[in-house]
């Protein structure tokens, strides 16, 4: 449980510092929202790096993250809808230490120079194929 608390603490600090908001924690995952896609991308990278520096005994966690831009429906403090499902499917498609983003996020953030197309796939509960991109940090230019 200490590792989960540490991961949540790191994630919350970075998300807030980048102008995002934690919507909820889902077991060992977190759902956050951002107004700015570039800030979401930067936060995603920062969280992945920060979490990989945490250790519990000999264990070093490897986070995976997924981003999607859309118009989810706000219900109280939560968000619902197809775009939330897309974001979850994009995150699930990421490998350890990887940040994936949907085509909508890459386009909205103008981040195509930091993205490499990975694949297109159909996901349950989503009416269209999802195109995902691996996103590399800005400092890797």
Model-found features: residue ranges?
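Residue-level signature of catalytic and energy-coupling elements of molecular machines
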Residues: 11, 27, 67, 90, ...
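A short glycine-enriched loop-to-beta-strand structural element that forms part of the catalytic core
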Residues: 60-73
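Active-site phosphate-binding and catalytic loops of NTP-dependent enzymes
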Residues: 52-59
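Catalytic-core segments of nucleotide cyclases and related cyclic-nucleotide turnover enzymes
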Residues: 74-95
